[in-house]
Amino acid sequence: MQEEEIAYRAINFCNAIGLTTSKRRRKRYDMFFESLSIYGVTLDVMEDKDWEALTYDLTIGHCDPASLTITVPNKIYVNACLGEEHALAVIFHELGHLLLGHKPVLHFSAKEPTRVEDAEWQADTFADIALETIGVRTQQMSFDFYM
């Protein structure tokens, strides 16, 4: 999937659920997370100890497209509710998997997948664009200074 299509979906999602830059004054996202159930999405929050025992702390989020379930450890959920950028990125990344229609498949090929074929890149891009749209993350500007 091309970046333009991902951007279209991310921006439309944010607009559809009412999370836009103008509504950024709200510092807690718990009501938004709870409202996902209206759309059939379950946000399953696991106790940190249970998460660590299950995943060996090798991941910080999981998405099951078959059941429309996103599972995260409690520390990610709590920080995301408070608007912490990294925690929000984790949840929006997992939402990206769902909203972009990803299925759990293995890549069987002699070549690495291209960037646009990579589901992780797509979910990261979705999260980046969504976070920009809601005013959490802004594009960093860099200036080249020559002496």
Predicted regions and their residues:
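Active-site hotspot residues in diverse enzymes, especially metal/ion-binding acidic/histidine motifs
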Residues: 1-147
